[in-house]
A protein has these predicted regions:
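Short alpha-helical segments used as structural interaction elements across diverse proteins
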Residues: 1-2, 58, 278, 396
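Active-site-adjacent loops and short helices of periplasmic peptidoglycan-processing enzymes
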Residues: 23-182, 186-187
Length: 403
């Protein structure tokens, strides 16, 4: 059935809420590139040089990991091959896996994301694709599918290469996708991991490299839920992180963070600055609730008792809003030719809310059954019978005339 655009009513609600509006200038962010996004909608809340080409270092590992999670089996055991270890330059982080060591996919993911063990990514790549090069092709294909515009990877782990680059915006896009996977979320939120004894090594214990989730760190945020650190001398300090507070989940990416003169870590200071800004200026607001009455109609051909019909929301509608200035509009699309009979919960249209540059739509449902008007139905039958009678008489007259 075609839909007819019907603007029933537009409501504009402007609420000015008391409270401080925390803001900052680009120079308050020490990192060369940064971005803050809402994880639910992907909306950008702050950015600084977010589309500039940057070296990602170990933040690369989130893409490697999500592909391994999606294509592998966490309980599978795989064997560490010599090539996976040999290509890791000295000085890069490692779990010192041994050639011939048998280890599960889940254990590899944990030591890869939590301890940043570079060889683990190569082991995962060979497990999934048979070779590191083939797996890297998958990485670039996945990045393209996710909408990344300026990303090109040449390895699984972020070991420096001039042709291995991305942007803060692309990493935020990848991180947002990764955080939709429950296994990924669980691993990156772990404060530590333990690799059980294997055929080549005793039990090993590793702490998460992300100080935002370390309770003993001066940068600890109780509402931080991951994700991944990174560092090379060329990339400088990097961090992708995620926080969830009061139902609002934000993702921050900072790249090229310098070492500050006071020995404080710019990647954590910048990330905390971004989260303070985000949670002081934005919130997730319930615009409307499932079952709310938003419109009322008289149904054509409905009987007197049921023809007056409320249209109710089919789902809750939540939106990211600026807490200091909420501007909400809505419009309604109703189906053509709404008439009885109608069953309760039938879909009769759509309501679309607009908040800033974001839109949210949900169905409009019938609140109750609407029955057809019996009198109208009877009249219709009588008229049909009369028409049939008239046609019969005409046919008889024509037939007699021919005789």
């Amino acid at each position: 059935m075609k839909f007819k655009r019907l603007i029933i009513y537009i409501l504009t609600l402007i609420i000015i809420l008391a409270g401080a509006n925390i803001s900052f200038a680009s120079e308050d962010i020490h990192s060369e590139s940064a971005i803050l996004i809402d994880s639910t909608t992907g909306k950008t809340l702050y950015e600084k040089n977010s589309t500039e080409k940057m070296y990602p270092a170990s933040t690369t590992k989130i893409l490697t990991s999500i592909i391994a999670i999606e294509k592998g089996n966490l309980d599978d055991k795989t064997t560490v091959k010599r090539d996976a270890i040999a290509v890791i330059p000295s000085g890069y982080s490692s779990a010192y896996l041994s050639e011939g060591e048998e280890i599960t996919v889940k254990e590899l993911l944990e030591v890869f994301l939590i301890h940043s063990a570079n060889e683990a990514g190569n082991v995962l790549a060979e497990y999934i694709s048979g070779s590191i090069d083939e797996f890297v092709n998958l990485m670039n294909q996945k990045a393209s599918e996710l909408g990344c515009k300026n990303t090109h990877f040449v390895n699984t782990n972020g070991i420096h290469n001039e042709n291995h680059y991305t942007t803060a915006k692309d990493l935020a896009t990848i991180a947002r996708y990764c955080m939709q996977n429950q296994t990924f979320r669980e691993i990156v939120s772990m404060k530590s991991c333990t690799i059980p004894k294997t055929n080549k090594s005793d039990k090993r214990f590793y702490k998460n490299t992300n100080d935002l989730i370390n309770p003993s760190s001066p940068y600890y945020l109780s509402y931080c839920i991951g994700i991944k650190t990174g560092y090379t001398s060329q990339a400088k300090n990097c961090l992708i992180s995620a926080c969830n507070k009061d139902g609002l989940e934000l993702i921050a990416v900072v790249l090229g963070a310098p070492n500050l003169s006071n020995r404080k870590s710019a990647r954590y200071i910048d990330s905390i600055t971004l989260y303070n800004y985000g949670y002081s200026n934005y919130k997730m607001k319930q615009i409307a609730s499932k079952g709310d009455v938003v419109y009322n109609i008289d149904v054509n051909k409905g009987n007197k008792e049921t023809k007056n019909l409320d249209l109710v929301l089919g789902d809750d509608v939540k939106s990211l809003v600026n807490i200091n200035d909420e501007n909400v509009t809505y419009s309604i699309d109703l189906e053509d030719n709404i008439e009885a009979p109608i069953s309760a919960n039938s879909n009769l249209g759509t309501i679309t809310y607009t908040v800033g540059d974001s839109t949210y739509s949900t169905k409009l449902l019938a609140s109750h059954d609407v029955y057809k008007n019996d009198f109208t139905f009877i009249i219709g039958i009588i008229l049909a019978l009369i028409l049939i009678l008239i046609l019969s008489i005409i046919l008889i007259l024509i037939k007699n005339k021919k005789k």
